[in-house]
Amino acid sequence: MQIKQRITNIAWKLLLPLLLILIWLLLSSLNIWSTYILPTPYMVWSEFVDCITSGLIWKHVGMSLLRVVQVFLLAAVVSIPLAIVLTASHRMRILSSGMIEFFRHVPPLALLPLLILWLGIGESSKIAIVFLATVYPIFLNALMGFSEVDGKLVEMAHQYGLSKKQIFLHVTIPYAIPYIVSGLRIGLGYSWRSLIGAEMIAASSGIGYWILDAQTMARSDIVIVGIIVIGLCGIISDALFRWITNRMLSRYMTGGDVYGA
């Protein structure tokens, strides 16, 4: 029954993309626009296959993936302990709340000109941009998870004689896990979005650079291939993240599934 339901869900998810491709085919056949503006699906597919067989696509995807993984892990290592510190210290949380709120509303790409001046046009400026975009959703979700632990559970743990360390390990962390996982998942998506923008401005490799280079050569078919590759990378990385977190953390969840699916 579950397999049948999954197949049905996949079919529904594919319905809209297939419909869009059919509309694209129809518009291409009517020759309303030149292929310079709107390439045919066949042109895009042909270029996609060529990029795979030539190895060009793997070069750019590999560089972007390496940057995303590095920054994502760094953001997680920084943001979760920081959330724990601010949860434990009310004074520190009040002191930092103004800066947190200010930079939460500043788009990371707005800082790119300054970061290029300070760090140069190499990897450091791109890493910094992606880090700033990734760290906030992880940090804010972790902070919410640690801060909103049910007071009744904590009180009950005190009554059973649990120490602060035991309460943190056996009450606070399991309660905060869904928030942390949600923040990590959002942060992973943000890391892809910000990286592509950073690579378009300051890079010599990566998917963003590849798309911008195609635009300068008036290759709209390659631009569309790049957009498709970004979407596929995001979908695959999100699915892999869900699989890993479900395997690692489902024992903490009563339903056996971190995402409740």
PLM regions with names:
Residues 1-28:
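N-terminal signal-anchor/first transmembrane alpha helix
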Residues 3-6, 30-73:
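Periplasmic/extracellular loop-to-transmembrane helix junction in inner-membrane transport proteins
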Residues 48, 57-61, 65, 95-103, ...:
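Hydrophobic alpha-helical elements at and bordering transmembrane segments
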Residues 90, 147, 182, 224-261:
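C-terminal transmembrane helix and the adjacent membrane-cytosol boundary/short C-terminal tail
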Residues 101-137, 144-145:
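Generic hydrophobic transmembrane alpha-helix motif, especially the helices
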